[in-house]
Each structure stands twice: as C-alpha cells, then as structure tokens.
C-alpha cells in the first residue's frame, strides 16, 4: 500500500504546482489567465465555474490527472458497467425518455452512456470519466423511486457536470481526499491543494450542475422535495463516499439557496 501511495504522491506533485501557479496573484487584483474554452459555454454555468479550466489547459497536468483517475477508479468503474444495466429504451423506457429530453434541453449531442447499478445506494447518481469517456451511473432507487421531474433534475445535474467537464477533477478530488486521510506525510500538501482552490471550485461546480438540473426540471417545488429526501438518504458504502461525503460537497440547504437565487434572476429577466 505504501508503495502505491508513494507513486501517487509523485504523480500529483506536478499537479500541485499547476494549481499553485494557476491561483497565484494578489487578492485585490487576481491574475488574468487566458484559457481556451469550449466553443459554447452553457448559459446556466455559474460565473465562478471556470477555475479548473486553467489547470486542465496544461496538457501534462491533464494527462497526469487522467492517469491517476484511471489507475485508482478505473477498475471500480469497469466492474460497475459490467455488472450494471446499460440504459436503453427497451429496459427502462421512462428513464430513457427523460434522459433523451434532458439531453435535448441542454443541447447535449454526444450522449454519454448511462448505467443503472446496485453499487450506488438510495437515491443517487454519479458522473465519471474513465479513458476520456463520460459515464452516468444511477442507483436502482433513482429509477423506481423518483417521478419524471425528479429524474430529470437528477439526470440534468449529472449532464451538467459532463457538459462543463467536471468529472475528471471530481474523481481526482476524491482520491486526494482519501490520500489526505491515509498518509500523514501528505497532509499539509494535500490540505493546501484541496481546501483552498480545489474544494472551492468543487462546490461551485455543484451549483452549476444544479442549474442544469433545474433547466431540465423547471420546478423548484420538486427540487425542494427531492433535496429533503436526499438529506435523509446519505450514502454509506465506500464507492459513494469519495464524492458525496467529501468536506467539499456543499450542504443541501446551501445548494438550494444558490439555486433559488439563480431561478429568481431568470424570472426577473
């Protein structure tokens, strides 16, 4: 185990430098970083949800992050996709229709694969990227226990992560949190890396994804009810924990507050 962690340490030390360099500058006058962005940034994107662009723009950093993500989560994701049920119109017609509708609403033309799996407990969904391929994972309870609008919010949320390119950084953020807990030596380094820039961006990325979910759902009452259910359905298995139980993951009340502000702005336009 120690040998593996040592390799991980060497692998992301360069990433530390990239994060540090991308956030350098005086607080009052932050340094402007030129970033090559996608041809079209969705209108729902949170105004601060551009931090990770400057990091992933570095080819070496991007390759390192992908290598780390694949090494430590690739096998888990492969097992999930092999043992789960791939979404088709035949096996989950209602979910399939809702997914197609969300893709149309968000203008997602390259549809990611969706798998329904028992590895996620309760009402849960997760978007990941392995070998440059985005995948959406859904729990069985999300299929049978949610109505159409609730499913659309959940699917739209994950599609928002994919559309903005969040998955790779989310995966590595989970790994770094895990390393921080396991290796005392890495504590100060990982804490500086995670708590200051990455966790701040991580929370912002959730606000953006919630906006995407709203675009697909268009019903705040549905979202409020769903958030109440999610608060009482915390994930318990190890596969879930790297994302949902992270200190960076914003509280439901905070997410709802931010989303309500966004909806109010839309209605006032």
Language-model segments: which ranges?
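A structural motif
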Residues: 172-193
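Amphipathic alpha-helical oligomerization/assembly segments
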Residues: 248, 252-255
């Amino acid at each position: 185990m120690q040998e593996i962690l040592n390799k991980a340490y060497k692998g992301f030390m360069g990433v530390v430098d990239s994060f540090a360099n991308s956030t350098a500058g005086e607080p009052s006058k932050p340094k402007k970083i030129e970033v090559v962005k996608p041809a079209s940034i969705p209108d729902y994107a949170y105004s601060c949800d551009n931090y990770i662009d400057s990091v992933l723009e570095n080819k070496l950093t991007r390759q390192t992050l992908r290598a780390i993500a694949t090494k430590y989560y690739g096998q888990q994701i492969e097992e999930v996709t092999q043992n789960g049920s791939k979404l088709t119109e035949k096996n989950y017609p209602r979910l399939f229709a809702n997914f197609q509708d969300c893709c149309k609403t968000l203008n997602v033309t390259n549809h990611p694969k969706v798998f329904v799996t028992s590895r996620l407990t309760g009402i849960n969904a997760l978007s990941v990227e392995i070998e440059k391929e985005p995948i959406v994972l859904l729990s069985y309870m999300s299929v049978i226990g949610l109505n159409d609008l609730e499913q659309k919010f959940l699917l739209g949320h994950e599609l928002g992560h994919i559309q903005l390119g969040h998955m790779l950084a989310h995966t590595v953020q989970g790994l770094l949190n895990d390393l921080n807990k396991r290796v005392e030596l890495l504590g100060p380094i990982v804490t500086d890396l995670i708590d200051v820039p990455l966790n701040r961006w991580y929370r912002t990325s959730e606000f953006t994804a919630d906006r995407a979910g709203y675009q697909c759902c268009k019903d705040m009452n549905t979202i409020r009810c769903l958030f109440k259910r999610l608060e009482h359905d915390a994930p318990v298995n190890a596969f879930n924990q790297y994302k949902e139980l992270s200190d960076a993951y914003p509280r439901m009340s905070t997410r709802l507050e931010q989303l309500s502000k966004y909806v109010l702005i839309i209605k006032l336009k």
